[in-house]
A protein has these predicted regions:
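Surface-exposed loop and turn segments in beta-propeller and other repeat-based domains
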Residues: 2-8, 49-62, 112-124, 266-272
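Conserved small/polar residues in nucleotide/adenosyl-binding loops
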Residues: 288-294
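Beta-propeller blade signature
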Residues: 95-106, 195-199, 245-256
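Beta-propeller fold detector
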Residues: 46-52, 110-116, 161-164, 205-209, ...
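Short, conserved, GDST-rich strand-edge loop motifs in beta-rich repeat architectures
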Residues: 1, 84-95, 231-245
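Short, solvent-exposed loop/turn segments at conserved positions within beta-propeller repeat blades
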Residues: 30, 91-96, 143-144, 187-191, ...
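Repeated scaffold domains used in trafficking and secretory/extracellular systems
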Residues: 13-18, 58-71, 120-133, 167-173, ...
Length: 296
């Protein structure tokens, strides 16, 4: 419902899946398993995708084991989005998987670009979805599903697995989803190379550790990449089975325009860094038993 150029969604949780065009004139949002597009300039709202029939009372239609993630919306109201989980109807009715769609806002048509079946439940897909989803200007669609990074050529409608066996501790994604940093899963906590991919142009830059050190991706501040280094002889498996990775320093790298210049290096005067947390533009660096001053 639109009222005074606003959308009233009624009583629902605060976590709304939505995306806004560059100028802010077009808003795509998900409401009760349906995708909608709102044109603020013309005060018009369009239903883009729904499994519901005209009556909306069919048990098959109302089976809510699916969800929608929006990748991109433009000024014409065209939307790239993903439907994942149990497919209530259509060509893949009864299957579980991920479908990539493109909605053309000018002619109001929707086209399935690819469907990737999955043997995991909707709940597992939901936990994985949203870790990375990006569409570049060439129309290449990237997403993480089933512990794999997929590259999907939407013209050829073919998926390619770029990285497999992903572990959450082995990769990080920038806020815009444009940059993806990872170490090979078989070298978790013992890698001397971090791969940094710019999904805008599919270029990969390898960050190499100094002699005698392992490196690990830690996160991003906007598009600036943060990674830590630990001495090889200090990395060990504790009695509880967890790996101790005591970092001797942190590095913040500029990724803009593929410059890869070092913006800042932080090395504590004593001891080692146990872990970090990133919030807004602040990195909180912590020892195992002692919190250090924040880096801004």
């Amino acid at each position: 419902i639109t009222d005074n150029n606003q959308i009233q969604l009624g009583i629902r949780d605060k976590n709304i899946e939505y995306a806004v065009s560059e100028t802010g004139d077009v808003i795509a949002f998900v409401q009760q398993g349906e995708l909608w597009c709102f044109d603020r300039v013309n005060n018009k709202i369009v239903q883009v995708f729904s499994f519901l029939g005209a009556e909306g009372i069919n048990a098959r239609d109302n089976w809510d084991q699916h969800d929608i993630k929006i990748a991109r919306v433009d000024e014409a109201g065209s939307i790239d989005f993903v439907v994942y989980g149990y497919m209530n109807r259509g060509d893949h009715e009864g299957e579980v998987g991920t479908a990539v769609y493109h909605y053309d806002g000018l002619v109001h048509t929707i086209e399935e670009e690819i469907f990737i079946p999955s043997d995991v439940s909707y709940e597992i897909l939901k936990a994985q979805m949203g870790q990375l989803m990006y569409v570049n200007e060439k129309g290449t669609f990237y997403l993480i599903m089933d512990q794999k990074l997929y590259s999907i050529d939407t013209d050829k409608r073919t998926p390619e697995v770029l990285v497999k066996d992903l572990k959450e501790s082995c990769y990080k994604v920038s806020e815009s989803n444009q940059y993806f940093a990872w170490v090979d899963s078989d070298k978790e906590y013992k890698s001397d190379v971090i791969h940094l991919m710019n999904l805008k142009n599919a270029s990969v830059y390898d960050i190499k550790a100094k002699k005698g050190a392992y490196i690990l991706p830690l996160g991003f501040i906007d598009e600036d990449f943060i990674y830590g280094a630990a001495k090889k002889d200090k990395v060990m498996v504790a009695a509880a089975g967890n790996t101790v990775f005591p970092m001797k320093n942190l590095t913040i790298m500029d990724t803009s325009e593929n410059s890869h210049s070092i913006l800042k290096t932080y090395e504590p005067s004593r001891g080692s860094i146990g872990f970090i947390s990133v919030e807004d533009y602040t990195i909180t660096v912590s020892y195992t038993h002692l919190t250090l001053p924040t880096i801004r």
